[in-house]
């Protein structure tokens, strides 16, 4: 993730280019994402309301926004460098900007960084998960199990991870947490915690190697997305249990297959036994037309006879959803 500069002048320039509407949206805790399409149409996703049209932006104005972000990221935005990725100097929100020729017109998305922590109890009261699922998660935390949260884009993986981390801090306040991320999204109130972030020159695998020298009690990774997954699994297996990570996958079982794919990027050996030993609990969350819900919680009991040994906890009712 490209490092940003947060000089007040750059912040003011970016605020001016975004305009009042988008600045207000970025201050709105219910906003999930702001999207500008190449045709100039704006859309905003809000919790409980889904995606709604929010007006339009001219190509010239969109180019100014992308250029301002690029400047803050100490980069350039032009036809030879048409992709700008990074964190906004306003709030640390995730930004992805695109310019022609890879799109027909300037486009960007802003994934708003969550500002409100949703307690695990709220997931139950709003019927995003069952009481049995919440109990399984709490039991896993108390037993220092490693938890993988799976889901698609926009399913709420990071928000759920923050809720689980808050439970960890409550259950084990003396534990030292080391948190590794590409983008700063994890919220952690632990007194003894260290947050590390990747850069253009330091990748996740390198951060994980450094983490082993930082005396972690629990290792938390914002998202596993490459061969560094193998390094994390080995760390979990060698005296650092009780960790949390997220992974892009639509179901709990497909999360195991995804881990197989990622570990294959770092090793030619099959890693099912390593995965079966390191991963204890998979929490699968999804977003549907009815809202977000925890689809399933699965306990992994190892890998034997060419199969993962699993135990399913109660699934949420089919008609349940979060508002």
From Swiss-Prot:
InterPro entries according to UniProt: Conjug-transfer_TrbB, P-loop_NTPase, T2SS/T4SS_dom, T4SS_GSP_E_ATPase
Gene Ontology molecular function: ATP binding; ATP hydrolysis activity
One annotated Gene Ontology cellular component of this protein: cytoplasm
Record-listed ATP binding positions: 151-158
Annotated Gene3D superfamilies: 3.30.450.90, P-loop containing nucleotide triphosphate hydrolases (3.40.50.300)
Keywords: ATP-binding, Conjugation, Cytoplasm, Nucleotide-binding, Plasmid, Transport
Record's subcellular location: Cytoplasm
Transmembrane segments: none
NCBIfam families: PRK13833.1, TrbB_P
Family named by the database record: Belongs to the GSP E family.
Name of the protein in question: Conjugal transfer protein TrbB
């Amino acid at each position: 993730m490209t490092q940003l500069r947060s000089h007040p002048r750059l912040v003011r320039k970016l605020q001016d280019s975004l305009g009042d509407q988008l600045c207000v949206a970025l201050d709105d805790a219910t906003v999930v994402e702001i999207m500008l399409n190449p045709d100039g149409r704006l859309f905003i996703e809000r919790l409980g309301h889904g995606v709604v049209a929010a007006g339009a932006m001219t190509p010239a104005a969109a180019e100014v926004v992308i250029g301002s972000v690029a400047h803050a990221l100490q980069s350039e935005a032009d036809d030879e460098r048409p992709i700008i990725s990074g964190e906004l100097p306003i709030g640390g929100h995730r930004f992805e900007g695109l310019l022609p020729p890879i799109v027909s017109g300037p486009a960007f998305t802003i994934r708003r960084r969550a500002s409100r922590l949703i307690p695990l109890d709220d997931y139950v009261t709003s019927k995003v998960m069952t009481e049995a699922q919440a109990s399984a998660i709490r039991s896993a935390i108390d037993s220092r199990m490693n938890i993988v949260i799976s889901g698609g884009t926009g399913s709420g993986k990071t928000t759920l991870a923050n809720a689980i981390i808050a439970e960890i801090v409550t259950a084990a306040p003396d534990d030292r947490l080391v948190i590794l991320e590409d983008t700063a999204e994890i919220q952690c109130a632990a007194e003894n915690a260290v947050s590390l972030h990747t850069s253009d020159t330091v990748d996740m695998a390198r951060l994980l190697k450094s983490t082993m020298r930082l005396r972690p009690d629990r290792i938390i990774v914002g998202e596993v997305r490459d061969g560094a997954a193998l390094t994390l699994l080995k760390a979990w297996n060698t005296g650092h249990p009780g960790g949390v990570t997220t992974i892009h996958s639509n179901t709990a079982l497909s999360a195991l297959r995804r881990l197989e794919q990622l570990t294959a990027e770092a090793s030619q050996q099959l890693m099912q036994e390593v995965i079966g030993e390191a991963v204890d609990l998979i929490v699968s969350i999804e977003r549907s037309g009815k809202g977000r819900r925890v689809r399933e919680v699965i306990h992994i009991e190892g890998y034997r006879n060419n199969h993962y040994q699993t135990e399913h906890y109660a699934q949420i009712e089919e008609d349940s959803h979060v508002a």
